[in-house]
């Protein structure tokens, strides 16, 4: 922990095509080994496909897909007197976006389609229609929080 106070958060510049910070964050998370050009190509190609399949503007469809994956509750482990409880907590807005992006990319990578852009567009289309692995993960997270509602008074 630094003595001079909290470290300021770095400002992420919006992406060049859609001028969106959300898209820039997604591209940065998608990137492997600093290969941003490759990540951008994948992202823009899958957004193009998403726009064609949904019949909506690609960025709006992408934002709706991310919105449908954002969790509002999560559980955090809390030790109380030798026992560990799963305590339901509200998720901060920036963490909601981070988790949604992470889940979308992870579930896209584990899909069976050929090529990452096809996998990513398929996962985004599923998220847009409120189904798929990332949406299931969100629902599981909410279910866990609901099941452990009895421990909500342990919040800190």
Curated annotation (Swiss-Prot):
Protein origin, superkingdom: Bacteria
Pfam families associated with the record: Ribosomal_S7
Gene Ontology CC terms, in alphabetical order: small ribosomal subunit
Signal sequence coordinates: none
Gene3D superfamilies given in the database record: Ribosomal protein S7 domain
Molecular function terms, GO-annotated: rRNA binding; structural constituent of ribosome; tRNA binding
Keywords attached to this entry: Ribonucleoprotein, Ribosomal protein, RNA-binding, rRNA-binding, tRNA-binding
GO biological process, alphabetically ordered: translation
Role of this protein: One of the primary rRNA binding proteins, it binds directly to 16S rRNA where it nucleates assembly of the head domain of the 30S subunit. Is located at the subunit interface close to the decoding center, probably blocks exit of the E-site tRNA.
Cited PANTHER family: RIBOSOMAL PROTEIN S7
Family listed: Belongs to the universal ribosomal protein uS7 family.
Assembly notes: Part of the 30S ribosomal subunit. Contacts proteins S9 and S11.
Protein name as catalogued: Small ribosomal subunit protein uS7
Organism: Nitratidesulfovibrio vulgaris (strain DSM 19637 / Miyazaki F) (Desulfovibrio vulgaris)
């Amino acid at each position: 922990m630094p003595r001079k106070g909290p470290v300021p958060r770095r400002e992420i510049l919006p992406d060049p095509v859609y001028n969106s910070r959300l898209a820039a964050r997604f591209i940065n998370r998608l990137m492997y080994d600093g290969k941003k050009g490759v990540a951008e190509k994948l992202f823009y190609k899958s957004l193009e496909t998403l726009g064609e399949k949904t019949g909506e503007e690609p960025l709006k469809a992408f934002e709706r897909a991310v919105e449908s994956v954002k969790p509002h509750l999560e559980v955090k482990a809390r030790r109380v007197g030798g026992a560990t409880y799963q305590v339901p907590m509200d998720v901060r807005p920036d963490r909601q976006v981070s988790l949604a992006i992470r889940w979308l990319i992870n579930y896209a990578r584990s899909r069976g389609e050929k090529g990452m852009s096809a996998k990513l567009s398929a996962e985004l289309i599923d998220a847009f229609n409120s189904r798929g692995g990332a949406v299931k993960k969100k629902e599981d997270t909410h279910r866990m929080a609901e099941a452990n509602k009895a421990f909500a008074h342990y919040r800190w």
